[in-house]
Amino acid sequence: LFEEAIDWVELDENGLMSGPILEPASRIPEKELNPATLEPQLNIEQVYQALVSGIRDYFGKMGFTKAILGSSGGIDSAVTLAIACEALGADNVRAILMPSPYSTEHSVNDAVALSKNLNNPYDIVQIDQVYNSFLKTLDPLFNGLPFSLAEENIQSRSRGNILMAIANKFGYVLLNTSNKSELATGYGTLYGDMAGGLGVLGDCYKLQVYELAKYINRISEIIPQHIISKPPSAELRPNQKDSDSLPDYEVLDKLLYQYIEKRQSPANIKEQGFDAALVDRTIKMVNNNEYKRNQFCPIIRISPKAFGVGRRMPIVGKYLS
């Protein structure tokens, strides 16, 4: 008996109202209120320039002048350091190398070589003593239990504390080096390697980080080739590799892109040929780690679906499929 009505006003080229003011809802033409997210249009040079501008703009507007970051000898910290040096000047970016009992010698050497190539100041701070002190303190509780993620994360959080202490003492801003693939899957330690005041690579998938490294090296080798070619590893336990915990990035990044940027359902992603079990596992990781991303620092946005400002999701994602 009743049909809702909508005020539908059309203006002609002179700004005058034309047509009926009131129409039944069934006669109102359908309008797409939420257009589909646009495909990313940035090439790798534009991504690089956007990140440089993002750091420079953020620091300039906030009145910051100097940055600090943890330099591990890995691809993420290497790319972040190179971009920060371009944005702020090498003299204003301090790299802190923090080897642990599980750090390889080549990672330390790679990190040193990188800072020498960039001509930025760096320091080496061993965390063995801090790490062992934690283990000794926790021994009454951990005694007899096998080595696990808890011991791994102590190393990461020790580094986070050291970086923040130096930042506080000397007035630096800590740059975070986590990439979008890691943030999506929760492959990071809260209050450890997720600490920071600005996430430089937080909207860049892992494969984009490799492309950025190649772009940075387009004229001469700034990032040592060994950093680019070696298998990525957090080096928190013997012989650790990212592939122990995550799918291959060639597959993972494409899957994540379909779920996050394209907003495809698990069923649609599986129809594209992705392994069903891998899709379920990956999407579960994404949904279950919203609480981590909710505590992450601001991210430089280069896509329509950057975590935080571009993708608002409830922390409890149990209902998501």
Give the positions of each predicted feature:
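ATP/NTP-dependent adenylation/nucleotidyl-transfer catalytic domains that generate, transfer
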Residues: D12-G73, S77-S321
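CN hydrolase (nitrilase-like) catalytic-core segments centered on the catalytic cysteine
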Residues: L1-D7
